[in-house]
Design a protein with these regions (language model features):
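Karyopherin-beta/Importin-beta family HEAT-repeat alpha-solenoid scaffold
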Residues: 1-864
């Protein structure tokens, strides 16, 4: 038995210690004997006598080697003969009779292609040939390998390679072939779709792709061939992926897809019918992004008829809930999507149908004497009513529905929900209440009287004993809209009853449930009502009284005997601690030094009890600094120690995130009292920000902390300046380009915020240097800085007013110091944009900044 086989067996051991030892020994062996390890693996893969698990692991290990950049240099040092040996053996193993070996080899080849394709390896050409081989296994494995190569290479593939891969897939969607081949082609194709945009831009190629998929379904429909159900499913998913990426190119071709999907709407396979409906929902998503209903508007009548028919023909299954009605749920989502993109005619038709449902003879009889109806009549009545509410839920996403319809239906819904425990379709009705809040809360929030009546009704519903916990959770979600969107002045007088209702739910029997956790959500909402209520004397008095109860609950939460599991105990503690944090951050309570210390000790007990630091704890500890340095100073050293610990665990970026926020709160509260801890803090933050895997949000928080540190530190912080300046330069380079059409919304928002934090940090550093008479340090950077901050206020960057104000102040500060030398870099057009935006703003602070820069730049304009 060879050494590498022995190591593989260790790696596959069920014993954790043996497995870890084997993995380390394998890595060491492969690092010292790189080629031998690879060649041995290849020999094992092609050896039919070797155990299957060892052969599979060999392929997996080769993939690991080629996937990690640390081995690339060793691979590049191999001779041409050695490289060819590895390639030939791997390619040969694709012909293995064993599917497991073919799959493992396919992944290894794909990983190798990432290294060798740019050097001219003809693997695409070879796989193209084998994808047309008479042996079906060759075809299938070639297609799988193509998919894996695309997965590894992504957008780095050349267009000619993409074209070759695409042709191979299309050629294998031929009804003359074995259905196992067709299945693989249609299944793997969904993963290729994101990378064929150029092909979709070409009308002929686009038509060819759509026709190839569509013809398979059409041939099945006219029964010229019985297409496997899984293939039909794959093709429908392919259409979904095509629309997810290429709605903007599909208008001329969509009529073919539409015709096919309408047939599938009413097929006898509910799963396929649901997928065909989902195709239209995906199309709506694309239209929503493009801000047009240029395709769906042409099909409103047909869609309305088809969707109504789906609801009429579904099984009379009154089982309520999100997971019980596959096609029905998909249809409801589609109605919602069609409404969101503005298909008014369809919405009107659906509202008309709802009215017909609720006013037919069966429903009139049910309204008068439901209890005396026969069982079949009751089922029919409930079925009709459920259909009406399911459709109405979808329609509610149309924001231009007549307000009278909304407010009238709201009262009927609440009336229905008061008998919730005897209503088999309660969940369907409750969701309508939620969707009214989601899309039309402005109608509830318009008048104090309407708002108060609605709030009182929701509180009454929450006071009821509701058997269906999902419905109770929906009511809590409605309460979230009241708290988050409601006028704070409107719910001031209800603050006590809202808090008491939520806490009663949080601690009621069976409220803690993993599937539907009423307890944790109630605690979350309690924190939110405290955050959002106004800081009136009466409210603060109420919250101060509640805080005493909260403190007692925290003490009780430290007793594990009060809970069924450790997880339950931890989650209740987290909820309580988060409420305390809300009280602290939003200054809804007052505390003296002794009370602050008492809260700290409870949190410390919780940390010790769990034997780990957790994010709610570090967040709350940082928030205690908001009560002022004089009160916080007694626990400062202990809290800062926890902050430093939180910044150690780079694997838990969420904990780091809260640690950075806590550090910032404490630094701002303590001023220069915490200077002694700054060097340790800087070292920790620099390690975090240099981590290549750092999340975007955490990077922004690091910049914010740097700003706070430089504003408040003494000259000793200067040793970190070169590294931070380089960080700024790198940040500018990475965020200089304006947004493009392909950039997603999250990236646009991140870059906007990131640019703002760069400017804030520049301001902080400049103030620091000015205070210590070292502002000349900026001289070597000023050219690049001015160009950057002048550029990012231009309209194509869509700058926020806060960014414009920050840039204005920064330019003013720079100009006052550097004066004439800045004339070379200043962009008058950018200054004009800044002046114009500040003049348009109604914010008093912006007016002050405007006055400042008008005075500062007066000589610049006079000399221009």
């Amino acid at each position: 038995m060879s050494l590498i086989v022995q190591l593989f067996e260790k790696c596959l051991s069920p014993n954790n210690q043996i497995r870890q030892t084997g993995e380390q020994e394998l890595f060491n062996y492969s690092a010292q004997n790189f080629y031998k390890a690879l060649s041995d693996c290849c020999s094992i893969i092609v050896n039919n006598e070797s155990p299957m698990n060892i052969r599979q692991f060999s392929g997996t290990f080769i993939k690991y080697i080629f996937s990690n950049d640390i081995y690339t240099s060793q691979w590049n040092k191999l001779s041409l003969e050695q490289i060819e040996f590895i390639k030939n053996n791997l390619m040969g193993s694709l012909a293995s009779e064993k599917q497991e070996i073919r799959q493992a080899s396919s992944l290894a080849i794909a990983a190798l292609a990432k290294i060798e394709l740019p050097k001219g390896w003809n693997v695409i050409e070879v796989l193209s040939n084998t994808s047309h081989h008479e042996n079906n296994n060759y075809r299938i494995t070639s297609l799988i390998t193509f998919k894996n190569i695309v997965d590894f290479m992504k957008s780095n593939l050349k267009q000619e390679d993409i074209n070759t891969i695409l042709c191979s897939f299309m050629d294998n969607m031929d009804l003359k072939l074995n259905q196992s081949v067709i299945y693989q082609a249609t299944y793997e194709f969904q993963y290729i779709i994101p990378y064929i945009e150029n092909n979709f831009k070409n009308e002929k190629q686009r038509e060819y792709i759509i026709d190839s998929l569509n013809n398979l379904l059409n041939m099945n429909y006219i029964q010229q061939v019985a297409l496997n159900e899984t293939i039909q499913k794959c093709i429908l998913i392919d259409f979904i992926e095509i629309l997810r990426h290429y709605t903007k190119y599909i208008q001329k071709s969509f009529n073919k897809i539409a015709e096919t999907t309408f047939r599938y709407f009413h097929c006898n396979n509910e799963g396929l019918a649901a997928l065909s409906v989902e195709i239209w929902s995906t199309l709506c998503d694309g239209e929503l992004e493009l801000k047009t209903n240029f395709i769906t508007s042409n099909y409103q009548d047909t869609l309305a008829q088809s969707l109504i028919r789906i609801f009429q023909e579904r099984e009379k299954n009154l089982l309520d809930g999100e997971d019980t009605l596959n096609l029905t749920k998909a249809s409801m989502i589609l109605i919602s999507c069609l409404a969101q993109v503005g298909n008014k005619n369809l919405v009107d038709r659906m509202l008309s149908y709802i009215s017909e449902c609720l006013n037919n003879e069966i429903m009139k009889k049910a309204d008068i004497n439901f209890q005396n109806m026969t069982k079949e009549e009751k089922i029919n009545a409930l079925f009709i009513k459920q259909n009406a509410f399911l459709i109405y839920r979808g329609v509610l996403s149309y924001e231009k529905i007549n307000s009278e319809i909304i407010m009238s239906s709201l009262q009927k819904i609440i009336l229905e929900l008061k008998n919730i425990n005897s209503l088999p379709i309660g969940e369907s009705i409750a969701y309508c209440l939620l969707y009214i809040c989601k899309y039309h809360f402005n109608l509830i929030n318009e008048e104090k009287k309407i708002f108060e009546e609605f709030l009182e009704q929701i509180l009454q519903l929450l006071e009821m004993h509701i058997e269906n916990k999902k419905i109770e959770f929906i009511f809590l979600y409605v309460m979230k809209y009241i708290i988050m969107k409601g006028n704070p002045q409107y719910f001031d007088k209800y603050l006590t009853i809202i808090i008491n209702t939520l806490m009663k739910i949080a601690y009621s029997k069976n409220s803690y449930n993993k599937d539907c956790n009423l307890a944790l959500y109630s605690l979350y909402l309690t924190g939110k009502i405290i955050e959002n209520c106004e800081n009136t004397d009466e409210n603060i008095k109420i919250i101060q009284m509640f805080f005493s109860k909260l403190y007692s609950l925290f003490q009780e939460s430290l007793n594990k005997n009060n809970f069924n599991t450790q997880e339950e105990q931890n989650n209740y503690q987290n909820g309580i601690i988060s409420i305390i944090t809300s009280c602290s951050i939003f200054k809804k309570i007052t505390m003296n030094a002794l009370q602050i210390t008492s809260v700290y000790k409870l949190i410390e007990q919780s940390i010790i009890q769990r034997n780990e630091l957790f994010q709610e704890a570090i967040c709350c500890l940082g928030s205690l600094a908001n009560f002022g340095w004089e009160l916080f100073s007694n626990i400062n050293d202990q809290v800062m120690n926890y902050v430093l610990i939180s910044l150690d665990d780079k694997r838990d970026f969420t904990l780091c995130f809260q640690g950075i926020i806590a550090a910032s709160d404490i630094i701002m509260s303590s001023g220069r009292e915490n200077i002694i801890i700054i060097p340790k803090l800087m070292d920790k933050v620099q390690k975090i920000i240099n981590d290549p895997d750092i999340p975007r949000g955490l990077k922004i928080k690091c910049f914010m902390l740097y700003t706070d540190i430089f504003i408040l530190s003494d000259s000793s912080i200067g040793e970190y300046l070169p590294d931070v300046m380089q960080l700024i330069v790198d940040g500018m380079n990475s965020s200089m380009d304006p947004p493009n059409k392909d950039m997603d919304i999250d990236t646009r928002e991140y870059l906007g915020e990131f640019r703002e934090k760069i400017c804030e940090l520049l301001t902080g550093i400049f103030l620091f240097l000015t205070e210590h008479n070292q502002a000349n340090v900026f001289s070597q950077y000023i050219d690049g800085f001015i160009k950057y901050i002048s550029k990012i206020v231009e309209p194509e960057y869509n700058p926020s007013m806060s960014l414009i104000a920050e840039v204005a102040g920064l330019l003013g500060d720079f100009y006052k110091f550097f004066k004439g030398s800045m004339n070379l870099y200043l962009n008058k057009n950018s200054l004009n944009i800044i002046f114009q935006k500040l003049e348009e703003s109604k914010d008093p602070e912006h007016k002050e900044i405007l006055l400042y820069i008008q005075q500062t730049f007066s000589d610049f304009y006079s000399n221009y």
